[in-house]
Structure formats: structure tokens, C-alpha cells
Curated annotation (Swiss-Prot):
Its EC number is 3.4.23.50. It is an enzyme of class 3 (hydrolase). It comes from Homo sapiens. This is Endogenous retrovirus group K member 9 Pro protein. One of its GO terms (molecular function) is aspartic-type endopeptidase activity.
Amino acid sequence: WASQVSENRPVCKAIIQGKQFEGLVDTGADVSIIALNQWPKNWPKQKAVTGLVGIGTASEVYQSMEILHCLGPDNQESTVQPMITSIPLNLWGRDLLQQWGAEITMPAPLYSPTSQKIMTKRGYIPGKGLGKNEDGIKIPFEAKINQKREGIGYPF
């Protein structure tokens, strides 16, 4: 699973005890939280001994009474004992993200800062293609070695 930072929130699916949940990837959350309205009624929960900070005022905070089996978005095996409260969407915290092997990467630019300035001055818009309609190639293509030594510059 991968998600590029954009206007859209990074959400992914997880299967907990055989039930599918969708949640927001939240690297700032220590623990995962399931929305109270999505928590199955027959799954045991208990009043939480600790409160939740950073999600506003949560009057009712519970925690699963059991450690639950979980499959991540790419079927990563994990376990979780989530918190449960009234929030609009589920949050996948670092307790699960670490087990899933989640990474945050910021790739190095494909082009040097100088070439980026030149391209921008000539009207290039990052993420768009080259050309009048901005529909040209969006990523550089790889030069391939001609092992057979045929074609331009080589006798046939």
C-alpha cells in the first residue's frame, strides 16, 4: 500500500478479527482508535484507564478487552488492542503502523534545482506532462544500452 500526500486523506483498509475496517493513517497517534459506531456489539470492551489526548473531548473512552488479530492493507500479520470512542473515522496509530512496516519517505528530486528553475521559467508545472497540452511524459525515461549494436550509428 502506498499513498502520495495530496488533498485526499491517507486511508487504508485493515481486517480485524475477520471484519474489514477503513481508517486514516495517523503517524501522530500512539494507538489505534476504532469509532464507537463501528465497534461490533458482541466484541467485549472495557472503560479505558487512560484518556485520549489530541482528538478533542471524548466523553466515553473504551478499550478492547482482548488483543485482536489484524491483517494490514497488504496482509501484514499484526495484533492490536484498540481504543474505542466516538470519532468520525477510525485511526491507525503507530501501534499498528510499526507492525505493518510503515515508512515515510521523501524521494530525492529527479532533476537538479537549476534544471527545475529553468523548466519552471519556461512554463513547466510540476506533476504535469511536457508539451502544449501538458500531456507528455511525466517521468524521465531510461536510456537502454543497445547490446546488439544495431540501429543509429551502427552498420546493419
